[in-house]
A protein has these predicted regions:
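Conserved N-terminal subdomain of the carbohydrate kinase-like
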Residues: 2-10, 28-118, 122
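Hydrophobic/aromatic ligand-binding patch that stacks against planar heteroaromatic rings
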Residues: 27-28, 171
Length: 182
């Protein structure tokens, strides 16, 4: 009997070029032989030169997307990407916690998207606080780049190998553990 294909959810922004965000996640999920599902957390007008506009749908719509999907589809893992506001982050965290308690999405990968590839800032200070306080406690894995790691830790970006190791250890301390051991 063939193995069931795991359903994997991306909660992220839409990059019309397909080079990042929800569309890129879905391509990655397909390449990894999983079935990708997507919840739109933001819409962007961007290209390789920069972000021109960001539209954040109402959190009620985000909640409706999440609840409708989780009520019907068994999600093995969730990856978050661009969550463009504190309200979006808090709603995402609240719904993930709710559905995890129902046995859904035991694995949560948080990509703390804070800066576009063009260098444009995507999160304000309040949203970063919500990310650290509400979403990171649910994370199984986080995938910050060096500038994002610096923001999460409130320090300058690590440059040396030793600084990177210290930053990785500090980031690991932000994640929950089952028994207190890694």
């Amino acid at each position: 009997m063939p193995e069931a294909v795991p359903n994997v959810l991306s909660i992220a922004g839409i990059d019309p070029s397909g080079g990042a965000g929800l569309y890129a996640d879905l391509k990655t999920f397909a390449a990894l032989r999983t079935y990708g599902c997507g919840v739109v957390a933001a819409l962007t007008a961007q290209n390789t030169q920069g972000v021109r506009a960001v539209h954040v749908p109402p959190v009620e719509f985000l909640r409706a997307q999440l609840d409708t999907l989780f009520a019907d589809v068994a999600i093995a893992a969730t990856k978050t990407g661009m969550l463009a506001s504190a309200a979006v982050i808090e709603t995402t965290a609240e719904r993930l916690a709710h559905w995890r308690a129902q046995g859904q999405s035991p694995i949560v990968v948080v990509d703390p998207v804070m800066v576009a590839k063009s260098g444009d800032a995507l999160l304000d200070r309040q949203a970063v606080g919500a990310l650290v306080e509400a979403l990171l406690p649910l994370a199984t894995v986080i995938t910050p780049n060096l500038p994002e790691a610096a923001v999460l830790l409130g320090r300058t970006a690590p440059e040396s190998r030793r600084e990177m190791i210290r930053a990785a250890e500090a980031l690991r301390a932000l994640l929950p553990t089952d028994d207190g051991h890694w």
